[in-house]
């Protein structure tokens, strides 16, 4: 897939040039006190890509992805592609889309067997069955600005990129997706030979949901010096993780952000993962179940310096 990209895009994916951002968003980003508004504005300001780290219970799909879609959809001509690794996550994305008002029209690419019954009316095959001519098909597909599917489903419909060019692709569960699985989509070409995907947003958590690889790390290790210079050390790593490592070196990286307020775990339960994996950045939302008194084994762990 790499050779199909322009040289500047190839340099971007290999970490040889930094991603670009629209500085006109900087003031709004600095002033907002809403975490989801902040990351949506950052995603909107990105010209190439943006990475969002979403620890457990921080609302990365139900709130952050939804807010991004609302922002992009408000721009009347924006074409949006929404991807995830599993059909269950795609169901969650569809649920988020269904909660947006006014209602957003979307088409889901995939099988009826792997789609929640609530969203089967949006399946591409069911929508096309209602069309009486190729012209109707083209009009229906052109008029819909939001497409949703698993990475595998979209990759299997390569002809979609001859009909549609997407201004942005938002990828949920991005840390579960290996680079070869994703690059075929990100490097696809539109009919006029422009990139079929203008920019991409990766949402995930490499501390929580890495890709599932059967090989051990030794067998998948990369030894080529050129690839290692590009940050590709192991074939089990996702594109998200490789790009994330690049930006960790920066003092205030524009290309990454992290949701820190979580509403799932009790502080006592969150104590260990917070310290061990998230540098103590996680904060409880203070929901009723998070305020209940429980014995906190994390205190014992802390005193004995296991962390």
How would you name each of these model-derived features?
Residues 2-7:
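Short, small-residue-biased leader/transition segments that mark boundaries at the very start
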